[in-house]
């Protein structure tokens, strides 16, 4: 079950039924999985926000779906000046209530929560509060993952270097949706494409004698 806002829904994407990240995730995972898209445009995580996810039809459908795996990406709309400045103190408890509700629906479900996708600096409210509130919500999400015992995945870092993938400063284009799907796929399967090293590490690289060298890369979990 993919739970979220318009980014999960696939808002602004041509043919969202094919190009939204949950649809792309379905193709990556194959027929052994059934992926449901329960994104609601404009939804907030905050239950006192302007459009609380837990009060939407999509939430109830996600609960009825009772998925074995639940992927949650919520918080972008909570940067609205109607929401975070007034109700920030409820964010962690509301997020934990959402997590707990999926555990009630399926006691064996595995839950992944995502760090927020970037908001580009051309967003009209970027410097008037959105940037700082976005950072505060990111930190809250990281703490929730730690204390609620759920898996944290990162929707921010893979998109951050590519602001052109956010044409309206918020919603990923088709290429960006592909990156989100790949991030979820890696988080679910532990398949990161095998051992991959930075292109800096080549057969002819020069090493400094007698100095420790930290070599970094990615590998399957």
Predicted segments with their positions:
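Short hydrophobic segments within beta-strands
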Residues: 3-4, 38, 114
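Conserved SGNH/GDSL esterase-like catalytic core that processes O-acyl groups on lipids
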Residues: 7-96, 132-135
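Catalytic His-Asp segment of secreted/periplasmic serine-dependent ester chemistry enzymes
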Residues: 13, 116-193
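Active-site segments of SGNH/GDSL-like serine hydrolases
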Residues: 73-79, 99-135
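Alpha-helical scaffolding segments of alpha/beta enzyme cores, especially the outer helices
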Residues: 90-93, 97-104, 136-143
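Proline-enriched interdomain boundary motifs that mark the N-terminal boundary
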Residues: 194-200
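Short, solvent-exposed loop/linker segments at the N-terminal edge
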Residues: 205-209
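Aromatic/hydrophobic beta-strand junction motif of beta-rich domains
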Residues: 213-219
């Amino acid at each position: 079950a993919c739970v979220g806002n318009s980014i999960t829904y696939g808002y602004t994407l041509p043919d969202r039924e094919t190009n939204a990240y949950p649809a792309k995730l379905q193709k990556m995972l194959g027929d052994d999985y059934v992926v449901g898209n329960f994104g609601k445009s404009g939804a907030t995580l905050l239950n006192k926000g302007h459009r609380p996810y837990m009060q939407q039809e999509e939430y109830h459908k996600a609960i009825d779906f009772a998925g074995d795996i639940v992927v949650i990406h919520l918080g972008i709309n909570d940067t609205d000046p109607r929401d975070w400045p007034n109700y920030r103190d409820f964010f962690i408890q509301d997020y934990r209530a959402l997590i707990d509700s999926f555990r009630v629906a399926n006691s064996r479900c595995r839950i992944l929560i995502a760090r927020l996708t970037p908001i580009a600096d051309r967003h009209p409210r970027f410097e008037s509060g959105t940037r700082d509130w976005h950072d505060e919500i990111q930190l809250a999400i990281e703490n929730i993952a730690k204390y609620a015992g759920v898996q944290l995945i990162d929707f921010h870092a893979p998109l951050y270097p590519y602001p052109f993938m956010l044409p309206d400063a918020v919603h990923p284009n088709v290429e960006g949706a592909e990156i989100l799907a790949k991030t979820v796929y890696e988080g679910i399967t532990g398949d990161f494409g095998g051992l991959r090293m930075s292109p800096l590490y080549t057969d002819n690289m020069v090493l400094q004698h007698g100095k420790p060298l930290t070599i970094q890369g990615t590998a399957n979990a």
